[in-house]
């Protein structure tokens, strides 16, 4: 049964996050998805991001809305970018263009430890109405909503 890793800060659960999470569950099939959620300690420089527990609750609510059984996933705290993927046995890692370099680093570390590399599943960005990627930063700035719809005209 496949073990699939996916990770992120998940500040604003937007359509890009949805695509990543859905892909992870699709690949897992009868296996399990391990969702690494960035810890407060890792984000200590960015005070505009909600605390770990609030982000965790929103993530749990989102997965519950997907009607995924609790035994099919586990949320783990990420205290570093690689999390448990360098030590534990996983089969896949689902990444965005932003997190792809981390997956390459994880596989280099795994190779040095004599572990099999993870199969990297690359998920493209989801684009907003204006053709640029949906991101939590853009949502926080009030440019777009979580579905990529424009909220106001961009300041040129």
Curated annotation (Swiss-Prot):
Its main location: cytoplasm. It comes from the Archaea. Pathway: Cofactor biosynthesis; coenzyme A biosynthesis. It catalyses: (R)-4'-phosphopantetheine + ATP + H(+) = 3'-dephospho-CoA + diphosphate. Keywords: ATP-binding, Coenzyme A biosynthesis, Cytoplasm, Nucleotide-binding, Nucleotidyltransferase, Transferase. It is found in: Cytoplasm. Its EC number is 2.7.7.3. GO terms for cellular component: cytoplasm. GO terms for biological process: coenzyme A biosynthetic process. GO terms for molecular function: ATP binding; dephospho-CoA kinase activity; pantetheine-phosphate adenylyltransferase activity. Belongs to the eukaryotic CoaD family. Reversibly transfers an adenylyl group from ATP to 4'-phosphopantetheine, yielding dephospho-CoA (dPCoA) and pyrophosphate. This is Phosphopantetheine adenylyltransferase. It comes from Methanosarcina acetivorans (strain ATCC 35395 / DSM 2834 / JCM 12185 / C2A). The lineage of its organism: Archaea, Methanobacteriati, Methanobacteriota, Stenosarchaea group, Methanomicrobia.
